């Protein structure tokens, strides 16, 4: 029986994780849950999974939850500190890090320092503080297992192979809802259109990131840290069917790819059960029915966010943290209809150009860059 704590339990990844857990009552148990937006749903999860500790967004949410609780009464915390407490709490062997954005960094670091294995869905943890997190993973001798479908695919395709035999890794991208949209029309695109992802069902922020291709850019940076690959050995190809989740090309010209229907329960289950596998309840892949798999080069002129991410990775230092923070602010402004679709990447670009980068060492130095970029992006948006 593997004990889990889930950070972001009421979000898309959290719900899919609990669905996998629900299918394997003799394999997994829940010791901690943390959420930020839906106290009512968290209460339902508490009644079903009976965790020892939980965390909510703020003190008011904690008071609301106390009034809702039934017979099972876990210890309640709140805020980032509360999520960090749940992440480090005794009992859990693995922590599923699925809080959206840079807010997931501090709790994930707390979990690593407490010796927990990490199932990482929060790519921003590595984007913002990849060097720090990588060093801590080694220091505390924990496993960092990818939950993103692309990185799970690479992880599986690397099994049994030497790093020196890798020519490059290739991340696949669906292309998002605007794959064929002319540049002049992108300026007029609103949140309603951008939120219509052609393949995946995800939260609002990551869906917008997929539309701008910033999500793929963040995944490039994540792949760099997960697999110790330089930017020059990380490629991106648009694959609209989202059947091949990513590939590894070896020095002999052979390419290993992981395929499957687009359902996040598959990579989640792989991370939870690793080094074993477990059932997911998802549909079987029928290649004959699909018929055709197609591939295209990404258009970095129409989607400059991907280029900005490569630039940030190559420049290093605090640039990836600034890229991520500015993007979070810009996406929120777009969802609130304060800026246009193409203004998202423009805001990130201007924030990066204004930044005087430095080499961070301590966690607070990474967070300082994050805070600066948020303020600067808000100033640019006006």
UniProtKB/Swiss-Prot annotation:
Gene source species: Chlorobium limicola (strain DSM 245 / NBRC 103803 / 6330)
Protein name: 1-deoxy-D-xylulose 5-phosphate reductoisomerase
A Gene Ontology molecular function term of the record: 1-deoxy-D-xylulose-5-phosphate reductoisomerase activity
Gene: dxr
GO biological process: isopentenyl diphosphate biosynthetic process, methylerythritol 4-phosphate pathway involved in terpenoid biosynthetic process
PANTHER family: 1-DEOXY-D-XYLULOSE 5-PHOSPHATE REDUCTOISOMERASE, 1-DEOXY-D-XYLULOSE 5-PHOSPHATE REDUCTOISOMERASE, CHLOROPLASTIC
Family of the protein in this entry: Belongs to the DXR family.
Keywords, in A-Z order: Isoprene biosynthesis, Manganese, Metal-binding, NADP, Oxidoreductase
UniProt: NADPH binding residues: 10-13, 36, 122, 124, 203
Binding site for Mn(2+): 148, 150, 219
Assigned EC number: 1.1.1.267
Role summary: Catalyzes the NADPH-dependent rearrangement and reduction of 1-deoxy-D-xylulose-5-phosphate (DXP) to 2-C-methyl-D-erythritol 4-phosphate (MEP).
Group of enzyme by EC: oxidoreductase
Pathway(s) annotated for this protein in UniProt: Isoprenoid biosynthesis; isopentenyl diphosphate biosynthesis via DXP pathway; isopentenyl diphosphate from 1-deoxy-D-xylulose 5-phosphate: step 1/6
Catalytic activity: 2-C-methyl-D-erythritol 4-phosphate + NADP(+) = 1-deoxy-D-xylulose 5-phosphate + NADPH + H(+)
Cofactor(s) demanded: Mg(2+); Mn(2+)
UniProt-annotated binding residues for 1-deoxy-D-xylulose 5-phosphate: 123, 149-150, 174, 197, 210, 215-216, 219
Organism placement in taxonomy: Bacteria, Pseudomonadati, Chlorobiota, Chlorobiia, Chlorobiales
């Amino acid at each position: 029986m593997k004990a889990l704590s889930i950070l972001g339990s009421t979000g898309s990844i959290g719900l899919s994780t609990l669905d996998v857990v629900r299918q394997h009552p003799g394999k997994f148990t829940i010791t901690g849950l943390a959420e930020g937006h839906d106290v009512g749903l968290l209460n339902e999860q508490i009644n079903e999974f009976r965790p020892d500790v939980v965390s909510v967004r703020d003190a008011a949410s904690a008071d609301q939850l106390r009034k809702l609780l039934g017979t099972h009464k876990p210890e309640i915390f709140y805020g980032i500190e509360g999520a960090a407490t749940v992440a480090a709490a005794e009992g859990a062997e693995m922590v599923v890090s699925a809080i959206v954005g840079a807010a997931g960094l501090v709790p994930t670091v707390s979990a690593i320092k407490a010796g927990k294995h990490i199932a990482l869905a929060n790519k921003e943890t590595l984007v913002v503080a990849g060097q720090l997190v990588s060093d801590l993973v080694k220091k505390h001798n924990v496993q960092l297992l990818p939950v993103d479908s692309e990185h799970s695919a690479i992880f599986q395709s690397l099994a049994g192979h030497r790093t020196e035999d890798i020519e490059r890794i290739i991340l696949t991208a669906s292309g998002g809802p605007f794959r064929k949209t002319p540049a002049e029309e992108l300026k007029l695109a609103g949140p309603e259109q951008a939120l219509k992802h052609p393949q995946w069902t995800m939260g609002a922020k990551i869906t917008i990131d997929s539309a701008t291709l910033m999500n793929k850019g963040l995944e490039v940076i994540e792949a760099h840290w997960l697999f110790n690959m330089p930017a020059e050995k990380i490629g991106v190809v648009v694959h609209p069917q989202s059947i091949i989740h990513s590939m590894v090309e070896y020095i002999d010209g052979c390419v290993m790819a992981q395929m499957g229907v687009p359902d996040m329960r598959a990579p989640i289950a792989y991370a939870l059960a690793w080094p074993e596998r477990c059932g997911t309840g998802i549909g079987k892949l029928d290649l004959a029915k699909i018929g055709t798999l197609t591939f295209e080069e990404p258009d970095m002129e129409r989607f400059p966010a991907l280029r900005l991410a490569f630039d940030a990775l190559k420049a290093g230092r605090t640039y990836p943290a600034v890229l991520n923070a500015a993007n979070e602010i810009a996406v929120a402004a777009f969802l609130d209809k304060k800026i246009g679709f193409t203004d998202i990447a423009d805001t990130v670009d201007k924030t990066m150009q204004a930044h005087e980068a430095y080499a961070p060492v301590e966690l607070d130095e990474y967070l300082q860059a994050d805070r600066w970029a948020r303020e600067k992006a808000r100033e640019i948006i006006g």
